[in-house]
């Protein structure tokens, strides 16, 4: 059992991305689904699919690359966990970070659900910074 399931998901995606895997399987949860939905909407992954295994389920994530077969590069250059179980990071509306000068996204868990930094600024809500993706 992992102490931080979201960090485990991000690590699995980062590792699969670095060896150019087509897909990666992750134990499912609603928070992970919300994070993957944002990553899909922002164009960092191709798609994800829920597979019912009779227990908690599995999320199969289809990764996205740019370039031809020979010089393939991951679309997602980096992904890091910000708020950890030992050190939670909360921000208000004025302190929502911009990732890589606006080229990346910060994913936040707010009172209105999981959303990107841009959406949180528009809705004027703060929350817990889950991760940065660029």
Swiss-Prot record:
Family: Belongs to the universal ribosomal protein uS8 family.
GO aspect biological process, one term: translation
Gene: rpsH
Sorted UniProt keywords: Ribonucleoprotein, Ribosomal protein, RNA-binding, rRNA-binding
Native source organism of the sequence: Petrotoga mobilis (strain DSM 10674 / SJ95)
Cellular component, GO annotation: ribonucleoprotein complex; ribosome
Protein name (Swiss-Prot/TrEMBL): Small ribosomal subunit protein uS8
Pfam families recorded: Ribosomal_S8
Reported function: One of the primary rRNA binding proteins, it binds directly to 16S rRNA central domain where it helps coordinate assembly of the platform of the 30S subunit.
InterPro entries xref list: Ribosomal_uS8, Ribosomal_uS8_CS, Ribosomal_uS8_sf
